């Protein structure tokens, strides 16, 4: 459980760093307003805010996020979020029932685009 919580906290820091050091990422988030959360079925999670070109997060869940990613448990969440081939891991998790998505799917796709900025320079997103 601690690894999952730490990974969600670290995700915030990685997104903040990408916004600060990558002008294309900064432009991607500059006018975006989004609230989402990543959690387990048991209720452990973190909610994230993207507003005014900034990314922030807090431990715990909120009532009405624009979308939610729910993992079966913390171990599955950690394994999927930290997988080298995240796209395949996400698709497999959805297929296997280890991950469910709810809320605004347009915002989920936008967030997927944001995570592309976390990839090392020169790594293909396709």
What does each model-identified segment do?
Residues 1-126:
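Feature captures hydrophobic
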